[in-house]
């Protein structure tokens, strides 16, 4: 605070001689220093190396109040959407990028006045409107006598019938309009990558079927104890992920990739499996890393965490980077059969389908078993048919009898 002086003039009382002592006196008072609200510029967060830019979609407008960590905008990249929160409570002062504009990491997004409050809009007070009195009811008219009907002449009775006039046809129910919606960055990137895979890879698909009887029985017997110990439900996906890791270790070519820049084959001694997850915004493929070191509980826990983040639109770009193999489960939508498309730059993808009761031959007898078709699409430039068929049979054996995993068979 600072000290100020003010000179006050005082008039003389009657009979008092004017002097410098009684004409003025000094009054001291204190003032507070005025603190202005801090204005900060919020920038685009850094992206992963595989992402260069994104499209901005604003959740707030200029003048809106925000609390700390409240989402101000969302940046849609090729792989996921990144939410940008407010670093502090305050008011949006200025938007530096238009809605739908492209930004890179570190681009200034908006200006925030910290600690400010939004101006409340003046509430307009309207005077109560007196309802108009209802109109008086119309006067009741006296009944009018109907005129007598003259007799119909004989010629009219013998007249020929006249055809009724043609009525216009009723209009067709429902419209036939069209609408155009701009492709989102994620949808556009998915389309580009799928076409890239089709144009680059020599894709071939091999099929097999899996008897799910044993894995269903194992789940029924141990699901309660599994949930009690690990606090996570036991599903079927972990069995296929673990079986895929087992088969990838046995057939390293399926886990490898072609480096087009050097014309070399890159073999990986680790297994990172991408699991396709459908979201309202499109298909995302978060990665389960080092699956070869995981047990069923670790896999189920990771799948559950990644699925929850995908449904809440909280996946980071780092969650989807990399991956040496992909599993897509169309069975959750009731798929019977299908051929998945490779997720580049990977060399193969496993497609799971629905479990249906079908008659199968067991020891020379027909039995009804829960069966699932599985499909492996692979890049024939790198993976031979023998390796692909052997790989799929490894998965079939491990799922039908999980003891094969324990015995490393």
From Swiss-Prot:
Keyword Iron-sulfur applies? no
Q: What Gene3D superfamilies would the database entry show?
A: 2.40.50.100, Chloramphenicol acetyltransferase-like domain (3.30.559.10)
Catalyzed chemical reaction(s) = N(6)-[(R)-dihydrolipoyl]-L-lysyl-[protein] + succinyl-CoA = N(6)-[(R)-S(8)-succinyldihydrolipoyl]-L-lysyl-[protein] + CoA
Q: Which InterPro entries match?
A: 2-oxoA_DH_lipoyl-BS, 2-oxoacid_dehydrogenase, 2-oxoacid_DH_actylTfrase, Biotin_lipoyl, CAT-like_dom_sf, Single_hybrid_motif, SucB
Q: Catalytic site residues?
A: 380, 384
E.C. number: 2.3.1.61
N6-lipoyllysine modification sites are 79
A single cellular component GO annotation: mitochondrion
Disordered: annotated span: 121-180
> What positions belong to coiled-coil segments?
none
UniProt keywords, alphabetically = Acyltransferase, Lipoyl, Mitochondrion, Nucleus, Transferase, Transit peptide, Tricarboxylic acid cycle
Specify the Lipoyl-binding domain's residue ranges: 39-113
Per the record, where are the segments of Pro residues compositional bias?
A: 131-141
Q: Return the Pfam families for the record.
A: 2-oxoacid_dh, Biotin_lipoyl
**What pathway does the annotation place this protein in?**
Amino-acid degradation; L-lysine degradation via saccharopine pathway; glutaryl-CoA from L-lysine: step 6/6
Q: Any keyword Acyltransferase? A: yes
Record's signal peptide: none
- Its Gene Ontology molecular function terms? dihydrolipoyllysine-residue succinyltransferase activity
The task this protein performs is described as: Dihydrolipoamide succinyltransferase (E2) component of the 2-oxoglutarate dehydrogenase complex. The 2-oxoglutarate dehydrogenase complex catalyzes the overall conversion of 2-oxoglutarate to succinyl-CoA and CO(2). The 2-oxoglutarate dehydrogenase complex is mainly active in the mitochondrion. A fraction of the 2-oxoglutarate dehydrogenase complex also localizes in the nucleus and is required for lysine succinylation of histones: associates with kat2a on chromatin and provides succinyl-CoA to histone succinyltransferase kat2a.
Assembly and binders: The 2-oxoglutarate dehydrogenase complex is composed of OGDH (2-oxoglutarate dehydrogenase; E1), DLST (dihydrolipoamide succinyltransferase; E2) and DLD (dihydrolipoamide dehydrogenase; E3). It contains multiple copies of the three enzymatic components (E1, E2 and E3). In the nucleus, the 2-oxoglutarate dehydrogenase complex associates with kat2a.
**Cited NCBIfam families:** sucB
State the protein's name: Dihydrolipoyllysine-residue succinyltransferase component of 2-oxoglutarate dehydrogenase complex, mitochondrial
The top of its lineage is: Eukaryota, Metazoa, Chordata, Craniata, Vertebrata
């Amino acid at each position: 605070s600072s000290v100020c002086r003010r000179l006050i003039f005082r008039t003389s009382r009657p009979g008092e001689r004017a002097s410098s002592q009684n004409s003025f006196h000094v009054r001291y008072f204190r003032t507070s220093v005025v603190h202005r609200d801090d204005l900060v510029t919020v920038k685009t967060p850094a992206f992963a190396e595989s992402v260069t830019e994104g499209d901005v979609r604003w959740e707030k407008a200029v003048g809106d109040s925000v609390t700390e960590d409240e989402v101000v905008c969302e940046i849609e990249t090729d792989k996921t959407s990144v939410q940008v929160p407010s670093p502090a409570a305050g008011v949006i002062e200025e938007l530096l990028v238009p809605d739908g504009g492209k930004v890179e990491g570190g681009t200034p997004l908006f200006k925030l006045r910290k600690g400010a409050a939004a101006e409340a809009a003046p509430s307009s007070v309207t005077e109560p409107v007196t309802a108009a009195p209802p109109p008086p009811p119309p006067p009741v008219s006296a009944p009018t006598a109907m005129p007598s009907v003259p007799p119909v002449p004989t010629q009219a009775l013998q007249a020929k019938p006249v055809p009724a006039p043609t009525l216009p046809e009723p209009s067709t129910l429902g419209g036939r309009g069209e609408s155009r919606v701009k492709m989102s960055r994620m949808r556009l990137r998915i389309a580009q990558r799928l076409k890239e895979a089709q144009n680059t890879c020599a894709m071939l698909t091999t099929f097999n079927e899996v008897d799910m009887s044993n894995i269903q029985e194992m789940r029924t017997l141990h699901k309660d104890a599994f949930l009690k110990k690990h606090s996570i439900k036991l599903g079927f996906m972990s069995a296929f992920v673990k079986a895929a890791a087992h088969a990838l270790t046995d057939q390293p070519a399926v886990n490898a990739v072609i480096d087009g820049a050097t014309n070399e084959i890159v073999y990986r001694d680790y297994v990172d499996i991408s699991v396709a997850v459908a979201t309202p915004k499109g298909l995302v493929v978060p990665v389960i890393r080092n699956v070869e070191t995981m047990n069923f509980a670790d896999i189920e826990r990771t799948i559950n965490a990644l699925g929850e983040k995908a449904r809440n639109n909280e996946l980071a770009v780092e969650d989807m980077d990399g991956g040496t193999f992909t599993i897509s489960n169309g069975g959750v939508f009731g798929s019977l059969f299908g051929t998945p498309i490779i997720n580049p730059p990977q060399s193969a993808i496993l497609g799971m389908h629905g479990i249906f009761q079908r008659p199968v031959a067991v020891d020379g007898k027909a039995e009804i078993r829960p069966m699932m078709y599985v499909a492996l699409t692979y890049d024939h430039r790198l993976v031979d048919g023998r390796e692909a068929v052997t790989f799929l049979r490894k998965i079939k054996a491990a799922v039908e009898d999980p003891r094969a995993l324990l015995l490393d068979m």
